[in-house]
């Protein structure tokens, strides 16, 4: 970053913001980068501001029982706030003085006041000086208030983040990430823009009093007629506002429903394509969109009338103010034009400034109260540790997670009852789940000495993770004692990867020890994986390690835990995603050898691990089922295997235990998710809700249990979207995932394989947040690239095609040599995304406008209609203006003129009625024309939005995965949320306002030019200067706004990342470290935002200076060239003053339109994406009636055809090569093999070897070369839909969308209820579905959060059974699966798919033994394709993974299955029960 010119700027330069000229000049000539941004002043740094506010808040907490955050803010910012408020007031007062001088100028042209003609020139000079003074007062005041608002936001940002890291887990249970992001974005952003309006709450009453006094002097009592109309108008607008809020609240629920389905579609786009559900999802979303648009139109019409009321109120304010006076005393031009000027100021104050100020205070105080509530929440309590303790002791410990699951079922009950489900089933369902809290752990006792290994086992929901949480202090015991040293290291069950390099993730801010680091890398089997990356361990990992396989993420998380030197290591199921061989090697080399002298607690269900543990603790229903050694376990608990394996399944648990399990499940995922989606409750909820957050959580568009990665989209309403947000989505060559799978691990669909030797990111470092956060934002450093990997620095050289994931990488400090790649990944909120800066121009192109206009043919005619009506309005206006400006000489005899009267009456009493009728007629005409003009425009623009949404949705669903892999899932969702919201809400009204303002200005200039042609000469250079200045500023401002948005993303991403890894972060004691990272992210954003505010104020001042020059020219031309006639001078000067304010408004509106049209550009970019191949590429042999059916014919009870394809399921693969993107490195090379009909093939290979990629290639989800044939039909001879329907798919990443059970099983509604029930019974789902009210019509929300992971897998299995597919693809179906569900899946595979070809990717040896052939994948290629006997006889991975004793028994197991030798199986079961139960139990 460069040193800011502000530091050495003079007072004049600061006053006129001239110090911003270098950045404006540079932005006009070239593309700006973050390195071009100036450093922030030290007073604006997050460290200083947060320390200042935190000190005052602590003082408030210590001194009062009811602390108020507003008091702390007042002590920090009050005096500067009031100083700028007084400047703002003085600037507003000048507006009231200007009409007085205008009246004197008009009066000087009275033929009877010729002696005053000589002072007209001085009055003109005074009038111009007032404009100059107003400019010099208002702009510094507005900028100062924006600056204070920015400082308040920064200070509260920091305070909230620090508090978040301290919150207790029980409080975090009731707070979703969506609520926190809303607190930081929607609420705190009000201070940035709103603080400048806050002072009008007291300025407007004073201004109104002053103006009414001046108007009273002119018109006496009739002045209150105009004020009364304004008050009525303000009340009318308030009523419209309430109506609009009602429509907005109704619409918010519909938007939420649409975004729920859309987000689920995006995060599971691979599954949608694999299931061929594109049309079903499109229809589902479009139906929701139709309902939403009905409410959108109603809200838009109300907003339109509200906006129109302001524009047309000017006629009636003047009319009602002057009418009573004119009827009594006649019309005096001086008074008319002075009153018009007063009314312009009065109208703005009463109808705009005061309501905005009241709304600002309402919003700001509400936000402060929410933040105050949040800051007083219960904090995390660190347990008292004894640092001299060498043992871990737990005595009679009992603990509860607070009840909270009941509210989920209450909502489910309410939501489904609203759908008129049967009430008879409610008791059946809810009686199964007690709503009372039950202990998650009861009376736990154990003691382990230093260096011992304690293995904790148990069935699903037994309390294993809760035990670790209690040791870490996250779960506070209600009874008993816990004793240990406090030096803990922790490895989570679901891997938490911090955006950054592999090295940074493992070191995690701890001092670097080369020998220890290399030892850990080797023990965790990461050497081979790291060696395949071009940058080795310095490769930048993306969102949650999205570029890695699930096994690689798990090993990095384990390596982080092992690298830390601690006394106690807590390992929560660290081997869940590892293949058998890798798991075995890591357990031996890492857990048993490298950590041999450390105390370890390992959560596992592997029998081999239990054998080698010093102590074993088996939990059952939260209680200690057994504690002792393995030999004691065999002797004392002969039934331990059923308890350990969980044969007492979830459905057999007692009601109390079920409630405890489900509560714990929600608790474990609540940090990563929002509350369940309420389909009926749409209103936003405050953080202060009857003392607890959990009562009415904010609607989420994402499910909390579906995964550990969880974000909430904070949907801004039209009233809240005050700013124009610029976003940027940088392409990343990786798997598309909005919510990386936490439970499911590696998905069947695309993922970057570690075998790829090419760069997984197209560019690892771009100058931007990544580099600038390497150093303090307050200090300038020259940064150069250093090639040594261990001390690598970051280059400032611009590199294209890097995502914000990489932008936010950096070290904590130069001195420590530590590097932390900070987070930039997200989505969940509109502020968190941004588009590829290279792909969208800094300024919206004319082509975008032209294309937008031609989207709907009616729009062109509507615009022509607007132009015609505008010409009619101008003609109508000229009638009154001409009449006033060209009044014939009055008749002395009939005139009411008196020489004693100080005011000239030009029009007779009789003719005044004639003027009155003309004025009323013209006003009514203008009002009617204005409404007729605007309504069709707004209606048509919303129709255009509807068309664009439909086209974009269709385009995304039909886009190939090679294209989607280069896009951020969050960016795609942002197009459907923020950009569509802009097209629906902001763009129509903004375009209407701009057109309205532009026509007003053009009309006023035309009238002035007609009345005084010389003025037109002054108008031409003003228009040219305006166009040039706007173009000059826009080129820079849009880039600054984009960089500001890019700088904002790390703030929210850092918050989300910190919350996801909060347990890990606390266990490692890295809170201060992450606070430093957060402050530097804030400082980076502040640098961008401060510069944007400064350049914006520079532009506003220049625009106003141009207007002042224009007004000076108009004033003196009018004074010097006008002869006799008050009317002409009055019209010209009044219109000139009106032009000044309106044109400045129009300029800002034009900039807003240009900014909003960037959303249209982004939508067009998505619409233009390529589509998947949908037609056969060459002719094939016809199957029926001489033609190949467009719809795949699948054998089922409904479709009985003579020719059915596929009939056998034979697959032939020839020279298959797969890539994620065109031109990318091959993930699989020259794969060739064949599978016989009905054969079962197992895929073997290390994690990341490409097994899942091969399954994706079968479905044509990747860029592939070569050929695959099914029953002799080549894949390039039929459509994609036909090809994919030949497969049944059971992916790791379970796809349950928000909808009924029936919709989830049969989205195309092809099957009858009876057939669905038969399949549900076959896969073991019937008992699950029947316990829900409504049964098949029960609406699942939040990714089916009320279902266990096993039940979700059964849903996928049921889909495959219904499809009657002949080829079944299974990718890790047993990952994190309870044994009961696993056994159901095995049984179903044997029965329902007995005649099908099955391709299985699995880590369980037991499941793989049922395969006839095995395909071994190594280094992108097929190494072996043989039977199990040959693999065991040769030196293979499979052989290495199985012990010799196992091998001896496996052959009999295989042979017995062939010759049906039951005695051998029985003997095997009796002799070695534990070997048969070989893997996860």
Swiss-Prot record:
Subcellular location: Apical cell membrane; Early endosome membrane; Cell membrane; Recycling endosome membrane
Motif PDZ-binding: chain residues: 1479-1481
Catalytic reaction annotation: ATP + H2O + closed Cl(-) channel = ADP + phosphate + open Cl(-) channel; chloride(in) = chloride(out); hydrogencarbonate(in) = hydrogencarbonate(out); ATP + H2O = ADP + phosphate + H(+)
Amino-acid positions noted as binding ATP 1 in the UniProt annotation, renumbered to this chain: 401, 434, 458-465, 493
Positions glycosylated per UniProt: 894, 900
Keyword Zinc-finger in annotation: no
Phosphothreonine modifications at: 717
Compositional bias annotation for Acidic residues: 1471-1481
Gene Ontology molecular function, alphabetical: ABC-type transporter activity; ATP binding; ATP hydrolysis activity; bicarbonate transmembrane transporter activity; chloride channel activity; chloride channel inhibitor activity; chloride transmembrane transporter activity; intracellularly ATP-gated chloride channel activity
Listed EC numbers: 5.6.1.6
Parts of the chain on the Cytoplasmic side: 1-77, 147-195, 244-298, 359-858, 940-990, 1035-1095, 1152-1481
Keyword Plastid: no
Domain ABC transmembrane type-1: 81-365, 859-1155
Post-translational modification remark: N-glycosylated.
GO CC field: apical plasma membrane; chloride channel complex; cytosol; early endosome; early endosome membrane; endoplasmic reticulum membrane; membrane; nucleus
CDD domains given in the database record: ABC_6TM_CFTR_D1 (cd18594), ABC_6TM_CFTR_D2 (cd18600), ABCC_CFTR1 (cd03291), ABCC_CFTR2 (cd03289)
Function: Epithelial ion channel that plays an important role in the regulation of epithelial ion and water transport and fluid homeostasis. Mediates the transport of chloride ions across the cell membrane. Possesses an intrinsic ATPase activity and utilizes ATP to gate its channel; the passive flow of anions through the channel is gated by cycles of ATP binding and hydrolysis by the ATP-binding domains. The ion channel is also permeable to HCO(3)(-); selectivity depends on the extracellular chloride concentration.
Protein name per the record: Cystic fibrosis transmembrane conductance regulator
């Amino acid at each position: 970053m460069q040193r800011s010119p502000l530091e050495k700027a003079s007072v004049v330069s600061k006053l006129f913001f001239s110090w911003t000229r270098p950045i404006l000049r540079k932005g006009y000539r070239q593309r700006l980068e973050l390195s071009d941004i100036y450093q922030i002043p030290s007073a604006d740094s997050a460290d200083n501001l947060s320390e200042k506010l935190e000190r005052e808040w602590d003082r408030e907490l210590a001194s009062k029982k009811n602390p108020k955050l507003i008091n702390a803010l007042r002590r920090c910012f009050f005096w500067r706030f009031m100083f700028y408020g007084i400047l703002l007031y003085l600037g507003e007062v000048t507006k009231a003085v200007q009409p007085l001088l205008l009246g004197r100028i008009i009066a000087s042209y009275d033929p009877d006041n010729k002696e005053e003609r000589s002072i007209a020139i001085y009055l003109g000079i005074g009038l111009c000086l007032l404009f100059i003074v107003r400019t010099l007062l208002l702009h510094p005041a507005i900028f100062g208030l924006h600056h204070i608002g920015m400082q308040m936001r920064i200070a509260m940002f920091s305070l909230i983040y620090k508090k978040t890291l301290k919150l207790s887990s029980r409080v975090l249970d009731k707070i979703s990430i969506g609520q926190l992001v809303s607190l930081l974005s929607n609420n705190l952003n009000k201070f940035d823009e709103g603080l400048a309006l806050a002072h009008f709450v007291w300025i407007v009453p004073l201004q109104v009093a002053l103006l009414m006094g001046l108007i009273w002097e002119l018109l006496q009592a009739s002045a209150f007629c105009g004020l009364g109309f304004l008050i009525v108008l303000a009340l009318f607008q308030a009523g419209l506002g309430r109506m609009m809020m009602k429509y907005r609240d109704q619409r918010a629920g519909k938007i939420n429903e649409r975004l729920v389905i859309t987000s689920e579609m995006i995060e599971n786009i691979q599954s949608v394509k694999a299931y061929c559900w594109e049309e079903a999802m499109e229809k589902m979303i479009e139906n929701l969109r139709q309902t939403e648009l009905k409410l959108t139109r109603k809200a838009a019409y109300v907003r339109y009338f509200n906006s129109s009321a302001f524009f047309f109120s000017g006629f009636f304010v003047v009319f009602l103010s002057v009418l009573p006076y004119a009827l009594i005393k006649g019309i005096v031009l001086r008074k008319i034009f002075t009153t018009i000027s007063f009314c312009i100021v009065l109208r703005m104050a009463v109808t705009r400034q005061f309501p905005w100020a009241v709304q600002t205070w309402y919003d700001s105080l509400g936000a402060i109260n929410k933040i105050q509530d949040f800051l007083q929440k219960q904090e995390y309590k660190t347990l008292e540790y004894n640092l001299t303790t060498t043992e871990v002791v737990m005595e009679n410990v009992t603990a509860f997670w607070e009840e909270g699951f009941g509210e989920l079922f209450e909502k489910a009950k309410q939501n489904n009852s609203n759908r008129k489900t049967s009430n008879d089933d409610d008791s059946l369902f809810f009686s199964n789940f007690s709503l009372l809290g039950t202990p998650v752990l009861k009376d736990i006792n154990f003691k382990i000495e230093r260096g011992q290994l304690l293995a904790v086992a148990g069935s699903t929901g037994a309390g294993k993770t809760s035990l670790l949480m209690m040791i870490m202090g996250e779960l506070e015991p209600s009874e008993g004692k816990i004793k240990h040293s406090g030096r803990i290291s922790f490895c989570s069950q679901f891997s938490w990867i911090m955006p950054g390099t592999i090295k940074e993730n493992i070191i995690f801010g701890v001092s670097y020890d080369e020998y220890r680091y290399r030892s850990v890398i080797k023990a965790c089997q990461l050497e081979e994986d790291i060696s395949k990356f071009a940058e080795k361990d310095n490769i930048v990992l993306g969102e949650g390690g999205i570029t890695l396989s699930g096994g690689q993420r798990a090993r990095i998380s384990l390596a982080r835990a092992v690298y830390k030197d601690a006394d106690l290591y807590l390992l929560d199921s660290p081997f869940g995603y590892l293949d058998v061989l890798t798991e075995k090697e890591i357990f031996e080399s890492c857990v048993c050898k490298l950590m041999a002298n450390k105390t370890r607690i390992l959560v596992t269900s592997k029998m081999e691990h239990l054998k080698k543990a010093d102590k074993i603790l088996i939990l059952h229903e939260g209680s200690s089922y057994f504690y002792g050694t393995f030999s004691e376990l065999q002797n004392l608990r002969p039934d331990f295997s059923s308890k350990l394996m969980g044969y007492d399944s979830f459905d057999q648990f007692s009601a109390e235990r079920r409630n405890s399990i489900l509560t714990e499940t929600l608790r474990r995922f609540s940090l990563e998710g929002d509350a369940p989606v309420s389909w009926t409750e749409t209103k936003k909820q405050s953080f202060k809700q009857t003392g607890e957050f959990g009562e009415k959580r904010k609607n989420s568009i994402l499910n909390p249990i579906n995964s550990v990665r969880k974000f909430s989209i904070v949907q801004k309403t039209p009233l809240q979207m005050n700013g124009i947000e610029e976003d940027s989505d940088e392409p990343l060559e990786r798997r598309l995932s909005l919510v990386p799978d936490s439970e499911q691990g590696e998905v069947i669909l695309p993922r970057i394989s570690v075998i790829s030797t090419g760069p997984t990111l197209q560019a690892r470092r771009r100058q931007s947040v990544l580099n600038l956060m390497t150093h303090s934002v307050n200090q300038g450093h020259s940064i150069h690239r250093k090639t040594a990997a261990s001390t690598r620095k970051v280059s400032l050289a611009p590199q294209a095609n890097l995502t914000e994931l990489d932008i936010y990488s950096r070290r904590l400090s130069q001195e420590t040599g530590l590097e932390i790649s900070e987070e930039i990944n997200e989505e969940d909120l509109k502020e968190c995304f941004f588009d590829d800066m290279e792909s969208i121009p800094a300024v919206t192109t004319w082509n975008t406008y032209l294309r937008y206009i031609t989207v709907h043919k009616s729009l062109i005619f509507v615009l022509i209609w607007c132009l015609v009506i505008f010409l009619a309005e101008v003609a109508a206006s000229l009638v009154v203006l001409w009449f006033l400006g060209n009044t014939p000489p009055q008749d002395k005899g009939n005139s009411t003129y008196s020489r004693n009267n100080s005011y000239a009456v030009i029009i007779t009493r009789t003719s005044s009625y004639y003027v009155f009728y003309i004025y009323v007629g013209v006003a009514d005409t203008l009002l009617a024309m204005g409404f007729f003009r605007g309504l069709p425009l707004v209606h048509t623009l919303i129709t255009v939005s509807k068309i664009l949404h439909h086209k974009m949705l269709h385009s995304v669903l039909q886009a190939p995965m090679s294209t989607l892999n280069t896009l951020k899932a969050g960016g795609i969702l942002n197009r459907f949320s923020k950009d569509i919201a802009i097209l629906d809400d902001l763009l129509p009204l903004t375009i209407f306002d701009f057109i309205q303002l532009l026509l007003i200005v053009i009309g006023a200039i035309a009238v002035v030019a007609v009345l005084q042609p010389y003025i037109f000469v002054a108008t031409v250079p003003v228009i040219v200067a305006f166009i040039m200045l706007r173009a000059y500023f826009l080129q820079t401002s849009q880039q600054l706004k984009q960089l500001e948005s890019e700088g904002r993303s790390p703030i929210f991403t850092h918050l989300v990342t910190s919350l996801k890894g909060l347990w890990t972060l606390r266990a490692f004691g890295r809170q201060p470290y992450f606070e430093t990272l957060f402050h530097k992210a804030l400082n980076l954003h502040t640098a961008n935002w401060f510069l944007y505010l400064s350049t914006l104020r520079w532009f506003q001042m220049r625009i106003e200076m141009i207007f002042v020059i224009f007004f000076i020219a108009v004033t003196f031309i009018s004074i010097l060239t006008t002869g006799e006639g008050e009317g002409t001078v009055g019209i010209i000067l009044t219109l000139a003053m009106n032009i000044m304010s309106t044109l400045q408004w129009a300029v800002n509106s034009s900039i807003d339109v240009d900014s909003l049209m960037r959303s249209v550009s982004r939508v067009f970019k998505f619409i233009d994406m390529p589509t998947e191949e949908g037609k056969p590429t060459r002719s094939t042999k016809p199957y029926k009636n001489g033609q190949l059916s467009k719809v795949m014919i699948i054998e089922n009870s409904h479709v009985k055809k003579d020719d059915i394809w596929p009939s056998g399921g034979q697959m032939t693969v020839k020279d298959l090569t797969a890539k994620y993107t065109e031109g990318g490195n091959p993930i699989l090379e020259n794969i060739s093999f064949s599978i016989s009909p009905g054969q079962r093939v197992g895929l073997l290979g290390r994690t990341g070897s490409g097994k899942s990629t091969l399954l994706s290639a079968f479905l044509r989800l990747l860029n592939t070369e070569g050929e695959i044939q099914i029953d002799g039909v080549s894949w390039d001879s039929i459509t994609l839909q036909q090809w994919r329907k030949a497969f049944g798919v059971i992916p790791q990443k379970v796809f349950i969308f928000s909808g009924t059970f029936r919709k989830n099983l049969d989205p195309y509604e092809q099957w009858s209820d009876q057939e669905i029930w038969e399949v549900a019974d076959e896969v073991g789902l019937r008992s699950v579905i029947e316990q829900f009210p409504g049964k098949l019509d029960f609406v699942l929300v939040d990714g089916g959060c009320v279902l266990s992971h096993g039940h979700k897998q059964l849903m996928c299995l049921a889909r495959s059974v219904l499809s009657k597919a002949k080829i079944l693809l299974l990718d890790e179906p047993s990952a994190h699966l309870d044994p009961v569900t696993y056994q159901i899946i095995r049984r179903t595979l044997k029965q329902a798919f007995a005649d099908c070809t099955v391709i299985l990717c699995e880590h369980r040896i037991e499941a793989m033994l049922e395969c006839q052939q095995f395909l071994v994948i190594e280094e992108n290629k097929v190494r072996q394709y043989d039977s199990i006997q040959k693999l065991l006889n040769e030196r293979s991975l499979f052989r290495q993974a199985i012990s010799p004793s196992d091998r001896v028994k496996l052959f009999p197991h295989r042979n017995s299955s062939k010759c049906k030798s039951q005695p051998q199986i029985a003997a095997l079961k009796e002799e070695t029960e534990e070997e048969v139960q070989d893997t996860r139990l």
